[in-house]
Amino acid sequence: MQQYFIKGQVENPVIIKDKDTVKHMFNVMRLTEDDQVVLVFEDGIKRLARVTDRENHVFEVIEDLNDNVEMPVSVTIASGFPKGDKLDLVTQKATELGAQAIWAFPADWSVVKWDGKKLAKKEDKLAKIALGAAEQSKRNHVPEVRLFKKKGEFLSELDNFDKIFIAYEETAKAGELATLARELAKVESGQKILFIFGPEGGISPSEIDAFEEAGGLKIGLGPRIMRTETAPLYALSSVSYALELNK
């Protein structure tokens, strides 16, 4: 069944006002009277609804659905700005894998440089990708997408997390394999977790120092070296296995 995220709080009847949502519902999917869909408002509760007025885009809420697919913890993925469209892939797949937020920041060794206008345009594009992926994967929430203009702005957010993991290539090369598994075993429901990944060039020594000063732990992600767009997906899969599948 089709699922749509609706801005604002639940009301009955529901009038869809967002132009993109209206276009997709009634022009692309060609919904008509009595067709049923799932609507998700900002409270994250899924609700079964049916079309009562196609011309005016009106729905009647039928019932709340007991369907929560969110992880028991809040996971934020933060990547140094990578080249090309790699963030597009990370955003789509991280949303499918359960991330609550997808962030990116200008790392010391990031090759790309985005000014204010490009940054806003990129952020808007990624937000749309996250919305589409959240609808497809039947999420209860659309992940926050945030691109930091300055690294200092990102660093100021680190105090808001219960655990910070730094995916560090040199740690993986040294054969460190146990830290992530050990720490995930200690995680409690509702905690906020941050994973930090470098761009193609990796994380600089000064960045490692700053992240560790904020309480971050260096981790390896298995014995193999991954691309910057692969590592976040491995990390999210590890969290899902530890906290959802292995319970």
Predicted regions and their residues:
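Short, acidic/turn-prone active-site loops that include or flank metal/cofactor-
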Residues: 65, 171-172, 223-226
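Mobile, glycine- and charge-enriched loop segments
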Residues: 37, 66-77, 184, 188-189
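RNA substrate-binding interface of SAM-dependent RNA methyltransferases
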Residues: 68-166
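Active-site/ligand-binding-proximal alpha/beta "capping" segment
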Residues: 164-202, 206-207, 216-219
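N-terminal positively charged helical leader segments and presequences
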Residues: 1-67
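Structured adenosyl-cofactor binding patch, chiefly the S-adenosyl-L-methionine
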Residues: 204-247
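Generic structural signal for residues in well-ordered beta-strands
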Residues: 59, 142-146, 218
